[in-house]
Amino acid sequence: MKFKGKSMTNMQKVTILSFDEVYLSDEICFDKQEQRIIGPCKSAQVVMARGLFSDWKQPIYFKFDQAMTKGILFEIIRKVEPYYSVVAIVCDMGASNQGLWKSLNIDWNNNNFFPNPSDNEKKIYVFADIPHLLKLVRNNFLDHGFTIDNSKINSQCIQYMIKNSNTDLKVGYKISQYHLDVKQAQRQNVKVAAQLFSH
């Protein structure tokens, strides 16, 4: 990245860091190059740097069984900042990341940024991962429904639409009982959540 950055404009170097825990099988493997056994590990924290105004991305950090912390995040930013301009971070709203947001004094009502650890005059904005938010909204809709203008709408409305759609005029195209019956791992499927709210 350091070498590539020399040929980029300042605009191309505007960077967002996205990170997530990737869940792994808990098997062990042997690293031939390092001559050591790796695992078993439950997850890997992976950080990706990507251009905001240009089409590039690069994995820059990974560590097994490691939640993101303020210290790790600041260390990564300090290593990237001499060559690129970090303006935002993006992550899901899992419990460990909610703890990170709290340690950065991020809250929805008052503060959506923190000072850049390399330059306190610069701000780094914090965004929730949109696919994760979409799944959370869908799950909340299925579990509790929404209240809009003092009226409750819930999955029973969708159920009624599915039941009363006929073959000549299908109101909820591609919506089926499957979209309402998602359980466990199926609740992590972004495509199914997007389909439910797209009709």
Where are these predicted regions, by residue range?
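Structured nucleic-acid-interacting core domains from mobile-element enzymes and related host factors
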Residues: 1-54
